[in-house]
Amino acid sequence: ILAKKMMGAGGGSIINISSIAGLQAAPMQAIYSVTKAGLIMLTKAMARECGRKGVRVNCICPGVIKTQLSEALWKDADREKAFAAQKALGRIGDVEELVGAAIYFASDASSFTTGAVLTVDGGMVI
């Protein structure tokens, strides 16, 4: 519905938030991973369908970010250390670190970007 309104209004930017789980399989997360992979493919399909009407559709795929949802992974110092060790940057991300990606996709700086999937994961999926 939103995409149709944006196409009728001359364009815009849709930013989907998926997860690195949609790019890389993880134990005991089949359903979560399938839904996130589906959102990535929806992003690409919508980018193709909406692009000529001026609507850009892109996707941000965060890794483990310190939120209430992921609290069990970082609240305990030993678990946080184990998850941080899996990343090239050696730490878990903060919510504020997603802002730059969102601003880029929402702004004219990404006027020639559509169907893109940007990982913001500290180098976990390399």
Predicted segments with their positions:
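Alpha-helical segment proximal to the catalytic Tyr-Lys
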Residues: 4, 48-52, 111
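Residue(s) in the substrate-gating loop at a strand-loop-helix junction
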Residues: 19
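Hydrophobic structural elements of the Rossmann-like NAD(P)H-binding subdomain
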Residues: 15, 57-60, 70, 115, ...
